[in-house]
């Protein structure tokens, strides 16, 4: 039996050359680009007199800078308009397909590519965005890269990389009602730390992982990078195949059968050798919230902010910094903490199942007085599907704003921003200082259902304990 993991197999299939430095030249099967990290790469390519090597393997969208209240052109923000116009020009000049605004296929890059069937098992995927690890949910090996590497992939369709070790994250049991993939990944990061995965690829496996939908697996892999892992993945299985079948870029006919047969062969076998393994029990995980200034500073909704005595010595300076910035006291219960803004969306939790979970909480209830709550679908397809189900009406009736697709308040490179010391309940992926647009704004990461519960209650609350609507 083979001892190779999926990571080993995909790496070997895409290895172009071993370099004298010991690094590997790795072929990239799919290159995703957007308006923020591509302009400088295209400019550098032009300066060097180079062309895009494989435009047919490059797909673009616009997501980070788009406004979500009105997407009429030209944008009110001149810089945002310039960035989009530059992307449009670069794609046109280089023969790259752009899923632009109003195309019906525009969306956050890590929502758009999977729903179109672009992301498939066995691929190597690169994108100039930290959360490219999302695509590992399909059994792909996906890397976030910087602008200079975007240039390299455009020019050569390859990257210079060092092979990672592989840690298997085995999750037994089943998630309890009201507990979601977001809670699972926050729990994993809380346990292993934001640097725990440095030098590793994470293979997520076990009964609890197999039970997750594709969209939940995307949430899980999306945040692998927040735990320090370069990428995270799930072995492809029937759930993967059922999701992909019939999507625009998925194989069809005889090619589909051949593809599925090959995809099955990629999974890590029973005898696969891992460099490390960590086990979790899904049944004991509660709805989880970040209280501090890194995704690793998380606690269950029924817990209190940890004291210094409960914090490992090496983490105490960061904990003290988080107490001050978040204006929280050691030992303070997280439940009941007032919030100002509630944001549902992002490449972590802006898919249809996320909106359904939040809408189920919002239905028949009202957003608390003084709370700004809004929902931003992850793509035009997600928005259309949600509207076809009437989810937009559910949210509006409850007092949420229903917005146009985009990255929105995840990173505030657009008009959606916190103001002053506002505190947000957010379904996004990062809670760093200033992440959501205000230098002093505060972010609590949680699942979409928990964000909806916070909006209704006006404060952090356990979604499982909401009174009947």
Curated annotation (Swiss-Prot):
One of its GO terms (molecular function) is metal ion binding. It is an enzyme of class 4 (lyase). Its cofactor is [4Fe-4S] cluster. [4Fe-4S] cluster binds at residues 347, 407, 410. The keyword Transcription does not apply. Keywords: 4Fe-4S, Amino-acid biosynthesis, Branched-chain amino acid biosynthesis, Iron, Iron-sulfur, Leucine biosynthesis, Lyase, Metal-binding. Catalyzes the isomerization between 2-isopropylmalate and 3-isopropylmalate, via the formation of 2-isopropylmaleate. HAMAP family: LeuC_type1 (MF_01026). This is 3-isopropylmalate dehydratase large subunit. It comes from Synechococcus sp. (strain RCC307). The gene is leuC.
């Amino acid at each position: 039996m083979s001892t190779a993991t999926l990571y080993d197999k995909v790496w070997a299939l895409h290895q172009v050359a071993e370099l004298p430095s010991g690094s590997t030249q790795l072929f990239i099967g799919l290159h995703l680009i957007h308006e923020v990290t591509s302009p400088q790469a295209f400019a550098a390519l032009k300066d060097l007199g180079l062309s895009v090597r494989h435009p047919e393997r490059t797909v673009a969208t616009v997501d980070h800078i788009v406004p979500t209240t009105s997407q009429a052109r030209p944008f009110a923000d001149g810089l945002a308009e310039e960035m989009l116009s530059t992307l449009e020009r670069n794609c046109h000049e280089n023969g790259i397909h752009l899923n632009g605004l109003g195309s019906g296929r525009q969306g956050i890059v890590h929502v758009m590519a999977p729903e179109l069937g672009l992301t498939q098992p066995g691929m190597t995927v690169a994108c100039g965005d930290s959360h490219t690890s999302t695509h590992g949910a399909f059994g792909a090996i996906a890397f976030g890269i910087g602008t200079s590497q975007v240039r390299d992939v455009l020019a050569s369709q390859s990257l210079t990389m060092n092979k990672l070790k592989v840690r298997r994250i085995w999750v037994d049991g089943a998630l309890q009602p009201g507990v979601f993939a977001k809670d699972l990944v926050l729990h994993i990061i809380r346990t292993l730390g934001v640097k725990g995965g440095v030098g590793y690829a994470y293979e997520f496996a076990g009964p609890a992982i197999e039970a997750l939908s594709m969209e939940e697996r995307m949430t899980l892999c999306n945040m692998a990078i927040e735990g320090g892992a370069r990428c995270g993945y799930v072995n492809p299985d029937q759930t993967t195949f059922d999701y992909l079948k019939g999507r625009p870029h998925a194989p069809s006919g005889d090619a589909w059968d051949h593809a599925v047969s090959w995809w099955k062969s990629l999974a890590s076998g029973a005898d696969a050798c891992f460099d490390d393994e960590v086990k979790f029990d899904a049944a004991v995980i509660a709805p989880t919230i970040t209280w501090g200034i890194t995704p690793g500073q998380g606690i269950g909704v029924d817990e209190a902010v940890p004291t210094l005595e409960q914090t490992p010595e090496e983490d105490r300076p960061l904990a003290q910094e988080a107490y001050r910035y978040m204006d929280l006291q050691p030992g303070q219960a997280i439940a009941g903490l007032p919030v100002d803004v509630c944001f549902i969306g992002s490449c972590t939790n802006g898919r249809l199942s996320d909106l359904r979970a939040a809408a189920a909480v919002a239905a028949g209830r009202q957003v608390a007085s003084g709370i700004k709550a809004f929902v931003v679908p992850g793509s035009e397809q997600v928005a259309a599907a949600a509207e076809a189900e009437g989810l937009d009406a559910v949210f509006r009736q409850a007092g949420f704003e229903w917005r146009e697709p985009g990255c929105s308040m995840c990173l505030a490179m657009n008009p959606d921003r916190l103001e002053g010391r506002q505190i947000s309940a957010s379904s996004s992926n990062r809670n760093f200082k200033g992440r959501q647009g205000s230098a002093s704004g505060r972010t609590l990461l949680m699942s979409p259902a928990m964000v909806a519960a916070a909006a209704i209650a006006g404060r952090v609350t356990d979604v499982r304990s909401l009174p009947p609507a």
